[in-house]
């Protein structure tokens, strides 16, 4: 059975005649695994995979030479098909005992079975198990490695499992990138073993979900990991490969600041004019991470990997929670085709979430490439700052002079850029929260206090207002600290009634599916997606002029003076905010009445958002309601705020009808 499963001889043969691009079509569509199988292949079969007649003649001549040559009876040769066994292994330099050998082609060799000692079990997969191991080089130096062994049954390895195992070997042996897990060599024993680079800190998912007292990962570090991942995926895409299983569980921590892409069992080459791979039959795939075209048609491409990158980004900023938890696999596709999307995690900036939404574009051609994502991530990343004065105000992020601060995003009143409250993470305490911008100085500001919001990225769309984060995203979310790991936000039960833990977007109040936990949905994002295809009227004519939101007070928003009870909506994390209204602060009953009126008029907004909107409009309830609806429509679509205002005006401020209109015309 082993000679039948071996297929690397075919790759070697095709490479010699510059036809390597036909390796996978011949292997998977024509099912050729041995030279004699070509006796049953007709010219029209080769025509069907796009091979021209001159190329067919070259292949025929190469097969004649192969069959006329000496028949090797070596079992190793039959598996590797002409990849010459390299029995000598380079030695480690004596002056650098802590470094792994240099990545040279000769290192990816056949390794004697006795040179590898397996230790503790690290994990298992579909066709193999992974152990920690020790590889003893001929020089006597021992190198820590990971050893992946083929799962063997009572009658030996199954043909499918062996083929998958060897396919993974053939992929990994040609990869060399600082953020891709490296294959050192192959052990041809019983069982077959891959000797790979060891990532001693385990998977990123395990680190994200580690319980206390393990501190959470810093936001700046997560952004670094995203840039490393985008670079590695751009490398795979440039080599014509699609990963198909991109998730935090398959990202390994080689060091505290370095991740490596691993698990190449589902990797396939991209072929054809459309540059995609289509599954030939039912095989297990990670449903919650897959793009709609992968679930509907079994089609995978670099664009579907970009979709998975967006889900992986969501995982990283939600603390490793499972996407679409509680939703049956057969319903995930329906949710995605209804334009439902995972909500913005509390730690994720609006700029990064905007990138995730671009990765989740319904049409693959509308998603950015990985090479483009590298630049976008650099622009959307957080800014580094240093605390210049102690902050001890109630509700604010506590910080001391000299603390390193990562500015996740800055925000200000729409028309009052001088009244700035920023959201960030204290690098000393790992806590996240809001704080006055004047309390920090930016690392690139020459030691001057920061007085205006900072965003290193460029606005993705819409009109740009001075002093706003992400171009024109203007709302100030004071004290918007995320809940502790393992806890959910204290949301009123009546308002949570229609939100499922599976994160699907619903407009009606229905039963909640049960299942694995998920981060609390951001209602503003989830609620605006219609349940079914609406009957849309013609596009309304957009006038050249548009009303502008009411002008807010120019006063700085004061710090709250009274601390509400813990179970009061204002006592929730991220909900404390004193609204500066025209003529001074409203009395508490009057303020609460207006907040309740706004909250009942705009479905899905939070108590804090209503209070912020009233503060920005001087207490005008109608203007606050309209501004919130414009804000929701803006974040749902790719249109500018002025366009959103005019569309809502046309639909008489019916947000549901306006949402259906913009979703039908993205």
Curated annotation (Swiss-Prot):
According to UniProt, the name of this protein is Non-receptor tyrosine-protein kinase TNK1
| A GO cellular component entry from the record | membrane
Q: Where is this region: Disordered?
A: 446-493, 506-579
Family per record:
Belongs to the protein kinase superfamily. Tyr protein kinase family.
A Gene Ontology molecular function term of the record: ATP binding
Q: Where in the cell is it found?
A: Cytoplasm; Membrane
Q: What UniProt keywords are attached to this protein's entry?
A: ATP-binding, Cytoplasm, Kinase, Membrane, Nucleotide-binding, Phosphoprotein, SH3 domain, Transferase, Tyrosine-protein kinase
Q: What does this protein do?
A: Involved in negative regulation of cell growth. Has tumor suppressor properties. Plays a negative regulatory role in the Ras-MAPK pathway. May function in signaling pathways utilized broadly during fetal development and more selectively in adult tissues and in cells of the lymphohematopoietic system. Could specifically be involved in phospholipid signal transduction.
Report the SUPFAM superfamilies cross-referenced here. Protein kinase-like (PK-like)
Documented effect of changing residue 339 to K: In a lung adenocarcinoma sample; somatic mutation
Spell out which residues are annotated as carrying Phosphothreonine.
514
Q: How does it sit in the membrane?
A: Peripheral membrane protein
Expression sites (tissue/organ): Expressed in all umbilical cord blood, bone marrow and adult blood cell sub-populations and in several leukemia cell lines. Highly expressed in fetal blood, brain, lung, liver and kidney. Detected at lower levels in adult prostate, testis, ovary, small intestine and colon. Not expressed in adult lung, liver, kidney or brain.
Low complexity composition bias: which ranges? Answer: 542-552
Does the UniProt entry include the keyword Membrane?
A: yes
The catalytic site is made up of: 245
Biological processes annotated in GO: protein autophosphorylation; protein phosphorylation
Q: What is its EC number?
A: 2.7.10.2
- Where Phosphoserine occurs, the residues are 60, 96, 255, 502, 519, 582
């Amino acid at each position: 059975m082993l000679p039948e499963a071996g297929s690397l001889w075919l790759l070697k043969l095709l490479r010699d005649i510059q036809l390597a691009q036909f390796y996978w079509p011949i292997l998977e569509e024509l099912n050729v695994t041995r030279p004699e199988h070509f006796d049953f292949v007709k010219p029209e079969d080769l025509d069907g995979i796009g091979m021209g007649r001159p190329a067919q003649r070259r292949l025929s001549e190469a097969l004649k030479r192969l069959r006329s040559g000496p028949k090797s009876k070596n079992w190793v040769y039959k598996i590797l098909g002409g990849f010459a066994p390299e029995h000598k292994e380079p030695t480690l330099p004596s002056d650098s005992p802590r470094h792994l050998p240099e990545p040279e082609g000769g290192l990816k060799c056949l390794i004697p079975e006795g040179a590898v000692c397996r230790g503790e079990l690290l994990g298992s997969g579909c066709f193999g198990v992974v152990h920690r191991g020790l590889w003893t080089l001929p020089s006597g130096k021992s190198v820590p490695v990971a050893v992946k062994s083929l799962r063997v049954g009572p009658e030996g390895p199954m043909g499918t499992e062996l083929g998958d195992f060897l396919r993974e070997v053939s992929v990994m042996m040609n990869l060399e990138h600082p953020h891709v897990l490296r294959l050192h060599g192959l052990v041809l024993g019983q069982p077959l073993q891959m000797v790979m680079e060891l990532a001693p800190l385990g998977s990123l998912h395990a680190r994200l979900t580690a319980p206390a007292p393990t501190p959470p990962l810093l936001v700046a570090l997560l952004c670094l990991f995203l840039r490393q991942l985008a670079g590695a995926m751009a490398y795979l895409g440039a080599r014509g490969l699609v990963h198909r299983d991109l998730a935090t569980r398959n990202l390994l921590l080689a060091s505290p600041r370095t991740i490596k892409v691993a698990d190449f069992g589902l990797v396939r080459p991209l072929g054809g004019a459309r540059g995609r791979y289509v599954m030939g039959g039912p095989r297990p795939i990670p449903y919650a991470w897959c793009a709609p075209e992968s679930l509907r048609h079994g089609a995978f491409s670099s664009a579907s990997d970009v979709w998975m990158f967006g889900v992986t980004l969501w995982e990283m900023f939600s603390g490793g929670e499972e996407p679409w938890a509680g939703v049956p696999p057969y319903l995930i596709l329906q949710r995605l085709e209804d334009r439902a999307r995972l909500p913005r995690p509390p730690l994720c900036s609006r700029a990064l979430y905007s990138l995730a939404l671009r990765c989740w574009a319904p049409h693959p051609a509308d998603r950015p490439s990985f090479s483009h994502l590298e630049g976008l991530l650099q622009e959307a990343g957080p800014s580094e700052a240093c605390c210049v004065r102690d902050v001890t105000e109630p509700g604010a992020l506590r910080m001391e002079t000299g603390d390193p601060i990562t500015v996740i995003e800055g925000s200000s009143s729409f028309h009052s850029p001088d009244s700035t409250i920023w959201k960030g993470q204290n690098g000393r305490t790992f806590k996240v929260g809001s704080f006055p911008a004047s309390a920090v100085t930016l690392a690139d500001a020459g030691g001057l206090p920061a007085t205006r919001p900072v965003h290193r990225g460029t606005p993705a769309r819409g009109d740009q207002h001075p002093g706003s984060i992400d171009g024109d995203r203007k709302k100030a979310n004071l004290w918007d600290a995320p809940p502790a790991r393992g806890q959910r936000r204290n949301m009123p039960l009546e308002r949570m009634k229609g939100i499922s833990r599976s994160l699907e977007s619903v407009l009606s109040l229905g039963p909640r599916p049960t299942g694995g936990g998920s981060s609390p949905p951001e209602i503003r994002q989830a609620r605006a997606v219609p349940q079914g295809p609406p009957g849309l009227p013609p596009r309304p004519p957009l006038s050249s002029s548009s009303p502008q939101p009411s002008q807010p007070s120019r006063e700085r928003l004061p710090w709250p003076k009274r601390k509400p009870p813990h179970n009061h909506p204002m006592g929730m994390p991220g909900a404390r905010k004193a609204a500066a209204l025209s003529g001074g602060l409203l009395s508490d009953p009057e303020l609460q009445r207006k907040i309740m009126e706004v909250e009942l008029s705009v479905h899905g907004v939070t108590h804090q958002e209503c209070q912020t909107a009233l503060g920005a409009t001087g207490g005008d309830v109608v203007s606050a309601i309209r501004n919130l609806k414009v804000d929701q429509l803006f974040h749902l679509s790719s249109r500018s705020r002025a366009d959103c205002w005019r569309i809502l005006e046309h639909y008489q401020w019916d947000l549901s009808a306006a949402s259906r209109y913009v979703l039908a015309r993205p």
